[in-house]
């Protein structure tokens, strides 16, 4: 995959749209329910699926997870969600657990849409099964954790049917304040952009313990701190801010140099707890990014600052979204005061500037299924994932890494266990 070929492919699909005649091509009656199957019943998966049920015409009809205890908790939760919305409880035949649960879910004729919220290592495998089965897919980020998986995801994207919608969980783009300032920035409100600063600072997720679990099960239940399962914090969590930078600049970086390590965290896992990355974009635009994920003080701060020849912009998760300079502008809608707005939400349910991000993205996605045009966001998801891998590789190897070097020599990861033991 040469750089120019990648850019051409990514640019064509980054908008996530295939222009088709609506309604007739999509086969859904107005206001009919889209039947959603949740694959991965953890905190984030449950939160997003609940939001789908509450904010769209989607109904949760099926659940799948590796572990039966997770499945049981999710079933109880969604029984209440469905009852509150006047929907039917989930049928016994649509509850799947074990290492083949994803295949059983994909094969079900009772499911239209699969939400993939499993550990990132499995995203490509689960994408492959869902897309091949003709399902619509909402896949959490990242679409892959290494270069080989990124290539696989790009190929899967080419096999998505014209009436099939596939979204990647970059909901920040759908937050109203961020979408509004993005339009200004892309329209030249900052002049020539010279430098960008970004951050993602959060406290650490608690270690998940489970009775009688062995080493492999402990890894899976704490996948967020496992390098092979998550891709490390830069690829799994910090990806939101890096995606915003790629989106606002309309490009991916050409090279990166980075440092980082694991200085504070003591629980199981091999992910780093901090990164400092200097990305260089076309036109010698620099993006300095820093992240931390440790501590128990519930601090959370994330966002971008962009500096141009005629203006500067702040694009935070929490705080004023504004431009200063010749084309001064500020997001005016009041988002209220919430004492929890500066706290990290492990399930991604943030307040303030991202308050409407999940519901708005979900509504747009469901509309693409019922009315069209269909989405195909896999190429854009691949480009952002590779950008994060570029920074990760530069940090691990302690040297400058180019985009071409990443594609030729990027790390690959193996799971190091068999899931058949959980059958």
Regions found by a protein language model. Give the residues of each.
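NAD(P)-binding Rossmann-fold cofactor-contacting core
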Residues: 57-82
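A structured beta-alpha segment of the ubiquitous adenosine-cofactor-binding alpha/beta core
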Residues: 82-116
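C-terminal helical cap and adjacent loop that interface with cofactors, partners, or active-site loops
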Residues: 9-13, 47, 240-247, 253, ...
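C-terminal segment of N-terminal export signals and the immediately downstream linker at the start
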Residues: 19-56
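Predominantly a Rossmann-like dinucleotide-binding segment in NAD(P)-dependent oxidoreductases
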Residues: 40, 161-167, 172-269, 279, ...
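Beta-strand-loop-alpha-helix segment that lines the small-molecule cofactor/substrate pocket
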Residues: 124-173, 188
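N-terminal export signals
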Residues: 5-25
């Amino acid at each position: 995959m040469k750089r120019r070929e990648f850019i051409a492919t990514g640019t064509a699909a980054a908008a996530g749209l295939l222009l088709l005649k609506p309604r007739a091509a999509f086969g859904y009656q107005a206001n009919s329910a889209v039947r959603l199957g949740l694959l991965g019943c953890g905190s984030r998966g449950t939160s997003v699926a609940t939001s789908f049920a509450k904010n769209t015409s989607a109904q949760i009809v099926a659940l799948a997870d590796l572990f039966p205890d997770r499945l049981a908790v999710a079933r109880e939760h969604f029984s209440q969600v469905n009852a509150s919305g006047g929907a039917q409880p989930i049928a016994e035949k649509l509850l799947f657990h074990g290492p083949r649960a994803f295949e059983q879910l994909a094969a079900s004729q009772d499911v239209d849409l699969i939400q993939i919220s499993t550990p990132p290592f499995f995203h490509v495998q689960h994408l492959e099964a869902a897309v091949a089965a003709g399902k619509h897919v909402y896949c959490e980020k990242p679409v892959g954790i290494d270069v080989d998986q990124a290539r696989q995801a790009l190929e899967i994207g080419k096999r998505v049917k014209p009436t099939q919608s596939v979204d990647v969980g970059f909901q920040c783009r759908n937050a109203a304040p961020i979408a509004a300032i993005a339009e200004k920035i892309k329209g030249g409100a900052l002049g020539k952009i010279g430098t960008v600063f970004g951050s993602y600072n959060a406290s650490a997720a608690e270690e998940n313990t489970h009775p009688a679990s062995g080493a492999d099960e402990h890894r899976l239940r704490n996948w967020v701190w496992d390098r092979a399962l998550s891709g490390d914090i830069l690829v799994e969590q910090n990806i939101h801010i890096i995606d915003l930078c790629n989106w606002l600049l309309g490009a991916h970086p050409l090279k990166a140099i980075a440092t980082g390590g694991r200085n504070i965290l003591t629980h199981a896992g091999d992910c780093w707890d901090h990164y400092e990355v200097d990305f260089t974009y076309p036109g010698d635009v620099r993006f300095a990014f820093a992240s931390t994920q440790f501590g128990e003080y519930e601090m959370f701060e994330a966002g971008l600052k962009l500096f141009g020849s005629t203006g500067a912009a702040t694009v935070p998760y929490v705080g004023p979204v504004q431009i200063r300079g010749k084309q001064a502008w500020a997001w005016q809608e009041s988002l209220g005061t919430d004492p929890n707005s500066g706290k990290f939400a492990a399930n991604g349910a943030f307040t303030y500037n991202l308050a409407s991000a999940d519901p708005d993205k979900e509504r747009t996605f469901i509309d693409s299924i019922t009315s069209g045009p269909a989405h195909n966001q896999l190429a854009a998801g691949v480009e952002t994932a590779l950008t994060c891998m570029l920074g990760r590789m530069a940090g691990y190897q302690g040297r400058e890494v180019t985009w071409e070097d990443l594609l030729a020599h990027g790390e690959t990861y193996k799971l190091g266990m068999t899931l058949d033991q959980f059958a």
